[in-house]
Design a protein with these regions (language model features):
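Noncatalytic alpha-helical scaffold of FAD-dependent oxidoreductases
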Residues: 1-118
Length: 118
């Protein structure tokens, strides 16, 4: 029987270890699966607390794509996080948290006609 990790029993330690190893190989930004980082990212400005399975701090769009691909392969949800100012728990979940605040913190382009932002 597989062991489980963290607050969520839906992911086995083997799945999380494989995902972490793949992320470390493919992401140029920071990959944090340690207990301290997971606890640090388990809350936002609200009262909710849910420990993520890991945290990725992407340096650019390639890191975001790599994270989503690894998460999809291992069936792990992805949760984008920016300001963590939600009072209703939108920034916390049993997922891989993508923290955009360190390197990807600017709007590069706004297209009002097509209604998208990059």
């Amino acid at each position: 029987m597989a062991t489980t990790v963290g607050a969520s029993s839906q992911f086995t330690s083997g799945v999380l270890e494989a995902a972490e190893q793949e992320l470390r190989r493919t992401v140029s930004g920071e990959v944090r699966f340690d207990k301290f980082s997971r606890v640090l990212y388990s809350t936002d400005a609200g009262n909710y607390q849910m420990e993520p399975v890991g945290v990725v701090i992407p340096r650019g769009p390639e890191d975001v794509l790599a994270t989503v691909e690894v998460a999809r392969k291992h069936k792990i949800p992805v949760l984008p996080r920016c300001g963590a100012t939600s009072l209703s728990g939108q920034c916390v979940n049993h997922a891989i948290v993508l923290d955009f605040t360190k390197h990807m913190d600017r709007v590069l382009e706004v297209n009002t006609e097509e209604r998208w932002v990059r």
